[in-house]
Design a protein with these regions (language model features):
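Core catalytic lobe of class I
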Residues: 2-241, 248-250
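Class I S-adenosyl-L-methionine-dependent methyltransferase module
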Residues: 244-258
């Protein structure tokens, strides 16, 4: 049987790959699973040129989304340590299936975080969606790790006199999207600032961080930058190659000259 090595990523279906990881092995999972919303991955918007967007984005059929969610969340629960946590990002369209799967698997919801970003997609006959959901869950509430003062000290203040520690721990995060103009990119990626924030609050150096839907490799790349061990699976060969190249070159952004 193939052995999964950490500090390495794999071009593999995560449902197959996670079965090769021992139970109670992973400290932290951060992931943004595929959509089921007819997402137009090649659309040239927000300064994104079609020619720079790597093809291959995979979606899940809406009628299959609950079972898909249950399957990968169940495996995630198996490989998480008792002290481990998971952050699942989702649009509102797929949120119901994910929340039901979390309950049925037996994980505990710690927080429901809102990522508020700038510039939602323009709409005609409904309100503009300009946020994303992040469900923070844990395996064992009594053993869950959370490093409360990893980013700001208890008495650190902003210029206007407010507590930076309190503000940073609020459950609405206003963090800008990253736009890689003129550079190769995948259609979706979480900003490095979000991943750094999660890594600092829910892991420490040399912990093992895992992403079952690696995409462009953000979780692995940022995890490596912060001295975490990493692992992840990406089923799309083009995305895997892109992520592998970023890790190999130790470069956050790649352009066509690289």
């Amino acid at each position: 049987m193939e052995k999964i090595i950490f500090d390495k990523i794999y071009n593999k279906n995560c449902l197959d790959g996670m079965k090769l990881i021992d139970k109670n092995k992973i400290d932290l999972i951060i992931t943004d699973p595929p959509f089921a919303i007819n997402f137009k991955a090649k659309k040239a918007n927000y300064n994104r040129k079609d020619s720079n967007v790597i093809e291959g984005y995979n979606e899940i059929l809406p009628e299959d989304y609950y079972q898909f969610s249950y399957d990968w969340i169940s495996e995630s629960n198996r490989i998480l340590k008792e002290s481990g946590s998971m952050y699942i990002f989702s649009g509102w369209n797929n949120l119901k299936d994910i929340l039901i799967a979390i309950d049925n698997v037996g994980l505990t919801v710690v927080n429901h975080i809102i990522w508020k970003y700038q510039f939602g997609v323009v709409t005609k006959n409904k309100f503009v969606t300009s946020h994303y959901h992040c469900i923070y869950v844990c395996k064992n509430p009594k053993k869950r790790k959370f490093y409360s003062f990893s980013r700001y000290g208890k008495n650190e203040k902003s210029d206007d006199g407010h507590s930076l520690h309190y503000r940073d721990k609020e459950d609405v995060w206003e963090i800008k999207r990253e736009y890689w103009t003129g550079e190769d990119k995948t259609p979706t990626k979480l900003p490095a600032e979000i991943i750094k924030k999660i890594l600092l609050y829910s892991s420490k150096k040399h912990d093992i961080v895992f992403d079952p839907f690696l995409g462009s490799g953000q979780v692995a790349v940022v995890g490596k930058m912060l001295d975490r061990h990493f692992c992840g699976f990406e089923i799309v060969k083009e995305y895997y190659n892109f992520a592998q190249k970023r890790l190999r070159k130790n470069e956050y952004r790649l352009n066509k000259k690289n």
